[in-house]
Each structure stands twice: as C-alpha cells, then as structure tokens.
C-alpha cells in the first residue's frame, strides 16, 4: 500500500492512477516444471505475484475512487525453457524471495526442468509461457466525480433487459 499511498498523494484531485504488472497466474508452466523436476519438494523458484482480487483491495485500502483491476493473459512461445529464463533474467525478474533455495542449482536439475517444460508445454517449435498482465486503475477522490445513483432509482426493470 505504501507506493499506492504515495501515488495518491502525488495526484491532483480526480487524477488517474494507472499501473501494469504481472499477476498471480504468470508462468504456471515454469512453476510446474520446477515442481516436477524437484519431485514437488522445492522451495519457490519464481517470485509470487499478486492476484486480481488482492490488487483491487489494495487500491481501495489506499483510498482510490472507482478502482478497477483488469486481467489479460498473453502467451509467448520461446525457443526453449532456457531462452525463457534468460528473458526473465534480462527483464530483471529473478527470484526476490528471502526463503528461496540458497544452494547452487545443478546443471542436471536445470536440464530436467527444461526437459519437463518441453514435454508438457511444447508449441510451434518452442515452449509456451503464459504471462498474466494486471492493469490497475483508480482515481484520486474529487467532488466532481460521478457518484452511484440511489438504490431503486433506475428507470428500466432489469428483468425486461434479460
């Protein structure tokens, strides 16, 4: 909430806050390959990401009006799991967890991860990677903002629309 609260203070009344970042359903294929290679007894090797519901709750907690969080999944095909991991490292998305595995990851383990990834998620001559992109929008409160109408003030019966 700290960054959101700072953003709120920086905005003018009725100012728009807009942010994009990875959501909780990012890289399920890579997570599964790591878990299977370690026989399901692994420390997390991929940083956790926030889910849609929690992102919306953070916007509300920071005091934003009209908060909305949208989710979009993008699928990218990489030449191999190693190309995907290089892409993640170049993007600066390495595991930031404090309780992550501290020892060296052996070559055989990483080869097994790549093998499992290719077996389970091959597509178009490469491997599929799914990224969930969350878009957060919220407005700094202002008296000019649209307000919800009173309950029961609608002119059309909802059952007529259906």
Which role does the model predict for each range below?
Residues 5, 57, 115:
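Active-site phosphate/pyrophosphate- and oxyanion-stabilizing loops and adjacent acidic/basic residues
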Residues 5-7, 36, 154-155:
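Glycine-rich, phosphate-binding/catalytic loops in enzymes
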Residues 11, 40, 121-125:
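Intrinsically disordered, low-complexity coil segments
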């Amino acid at each position: 909430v700290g960054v959101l609260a700072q953003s709120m203070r920086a905005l003018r009344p009725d100012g728009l806050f807009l942010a994009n970042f990875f959501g909780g359903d990012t890289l399920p294929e890579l997570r599964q390959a790591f878990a299977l290679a370690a026989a399901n007894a692994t420390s997390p090797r991929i940083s956790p990401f926030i889910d849609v519901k929690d992102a919306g709750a953070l916007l509300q907690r920071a005091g934003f009006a009209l908060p909305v969080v949208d989710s979009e999944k993008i699928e990218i095909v990489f030449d191999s799991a190693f190309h995907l991991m290089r892409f993640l490292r170049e993007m600066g998305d390495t595991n930031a967890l404090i309780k992550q595995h501290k020892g060296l990851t052996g070559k055989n383990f990483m080869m097994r991860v790549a093998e499992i990834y290719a077996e389970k998620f091959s597509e178009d001559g490469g491997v599929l990677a799914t990224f969930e992109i969350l878009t957060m929008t919220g407005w700094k409160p202002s008296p000019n903002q649209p307000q919800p109408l009173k309950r029961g003030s609608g002119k059309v019966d909802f059952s007529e629309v259906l």
